Amino acid sequence: VQLGQKNLLIDSQGNWGNILTGDSAAAPRYIEARLSKFALDVLFNPKTTEWKMSYDGRKKEPVSLPVKFPLLLAQGAEGIAVGLSAKILPHNFGELCEAAIKYLHGEEFHLYPDFQTGGSIDVSRYNDGMRGGAVKVRAKIEKLDNKTLVIREVPYGKTTSTLIDSILKANEKGKIKIRKVEDNTAAEAEIHVHLTPGTSSDKAIDALYAFTDCETSINPNCCVIDEKKPKFLSVSDVLRRSVDHTRSLLEKELMIRRGELMESLHFASLERIFIEERIYKDRAFEQAKDMDAAVSHIDSRLEPYKPQFYREVTRDDILRLMEIKMGRILKFNKEKANELIARMKEEVARID
């Protein structure tokens, strides 16, 4: 549900709750989800995924997904364990990309939290997300008129319900004088605070920040699992490691793609020679007494061309040539075959 509410990795349909009001999502049978195009592109690649056997040994499951962007920093995380706790605040996706580019260029960068619920933030003591740091988050309060205040954005970690409760409690304690509070939140937060006659709106705003959840303090603690051990890092270090990991994944994907291209080039070259030289029509091939004799004949006919192939010709290569159907041979076009080989060579050159 949290991933769906972020609108980054999951395309959601139905009632997925509301992060502003704290309303929970509908039952699973009433909601639908699918991976976004972005998620399919940056989260999944079976060729670079590390797999392990499932608990019953019948299927394989991923040890981890080959994520090619700093998901931990974009999504944020919070948890507690024996003697440990973690509170990693979410960050703006665009700012993460910009910081990653600066890191790749060897330039200095700074990262600060960004909250989906809005509000303003004081990051002077953020301490790069490490222990001992703190950030102050404020709601956005506007004056509708002299007697009415409107809260348009709520602090991170709070909902309109908890915010209203804190305002009512402050009113009961005499910290602020209000007549009533109305929650008109829909797609965006909108809480109307009606002041009692004679109450200064400026003083009321100061009181809301001082005595209610309109201003909160958050203590980040960037604790991650590194090589199966807990480690305290800064968010900048997490980004650097994520970028290095992404670069290694991209290099691995390119090498896999290059290997596939070289295999395709090798067989395309074999196929072209096999068809152009009409090896399939050789009498010795057609009258071969067994499979070994047929393979041996094709191998000997390919001998003069082996220096131009991309690797050694194996028995499996020859067996694959023998499986080419006559329809494919009849439709063979030399120009198209050469164009295909040229395109694959160009792509290999770009990878190199």
Q: Model segments located where?
A:
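C-terminal interaction appendages of subunits in large macromolecular complexes
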Residues: 77-80, 84-352
